[in-house]
């Protein structure tokens, strides 16, 4: 059975734990208890494949930022979560993405942008803004509500699909032996 290491990142209070617990335990946690780091495992079937999700729910608080490099190193894919009623959390996404790219030493890291709390009327981040940001990053955007469960499975399952595609790209890189590759120096031994 394939195991996927998913990491949930984002500013404090955006609902990272609520999303994760909604996926794992099917219930909404409405009291806010800042996370340091929690790990969850769940067996699911995605596109006919049984797989094990190993989900790391991380601290959004700045005082735990030193721990980020470690979990970013081990994660295969990242849910970058902001709250649609918190513009600052949306603006913070850029720093999380840059840190992930730096730690992974790659521009090609599986990620999904997640706008949480879409059940709330007091929206300060428009869907269009988030879609534009996701498009500029070349990643999917999904709106979720940990409270109503809307989009929760979709967000995590989409990330698994992104990881699968990433692995396929690494196994089958674009053909570089075409006419544009005159500087290749192949050594056969």
Swiss-Prot record:
Which cysteines link up through disulfide bonds? none
Lipid-carrying residues in chain (S-palmitoyl cysteine): 181, 184
Look up what happens after changing residue 37 to G.
No effect on interaction with PLCE1
Carbohydrate attachment residues: 35
One MF annotation (Gene Ontology) recorded for this entry: GTPase activity
Which residues are annotated as modified residue N-acetylthreonine in the UniProt record?
2
Q: Where is the lipid attached (S-farnesyl cysteine)?
A: 186
| Post-translational events | Palmitoylated by the ZDHHC9-GOLGA7 complex. A continuous cycle of de- and re-palmitoylation regulates rapid exchange between plasma membrane and Golgi. S-nitrosylated; critical for redox regulation. Important for stimulating guanine nucleotide exchange. No structural perturbation on nitrosylation.
The name this protein goes by in its record:
GTPase HRas
What lineage does UniProt assign to this protein's organism? Eukaryota, Metazoa, Chordata, Craniata, Vertebrata
């Amino acid at each position: 059975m394939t195991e996927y290491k998913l990491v949930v990142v984002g500013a404090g209070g955006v609902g990272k734990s609520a999303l994760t617990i909604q996926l794992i335990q099917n219930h909404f946690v409405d009291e806010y208890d800042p996370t340091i780091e929690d790990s969850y495992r769940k067996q699911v079937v995605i596109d006919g494949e049984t797989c094990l999700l190993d989900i790391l729910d991380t601290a959004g608080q700045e005082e735990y930022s030193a721990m980020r490099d470690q979990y970013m190193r081990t994660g295969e894919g990242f849910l970058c979560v902001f709250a649609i009623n918190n513009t600052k959390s949306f603006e913070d996404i850029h720093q999380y993405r840059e840190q992930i790219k730096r730690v992974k030493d790659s521009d090609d890291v599986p990620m999904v942008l997640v706008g949480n709390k879409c059940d709330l009327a007091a929206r300060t981040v428009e869907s269009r803004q988030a879609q534009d940001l996701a498009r500029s990053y070349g990643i999917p955007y999904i709106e979720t509500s940990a409270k109503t469960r809307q989009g929760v499975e979709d967000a995590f399952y989409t990330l698994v699909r992104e990881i699968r595609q990433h692995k396929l790209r690494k196994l089958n890189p674009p053909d570089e032996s075409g006419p544009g590759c005159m500087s290749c120096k192949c050594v056969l031994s």
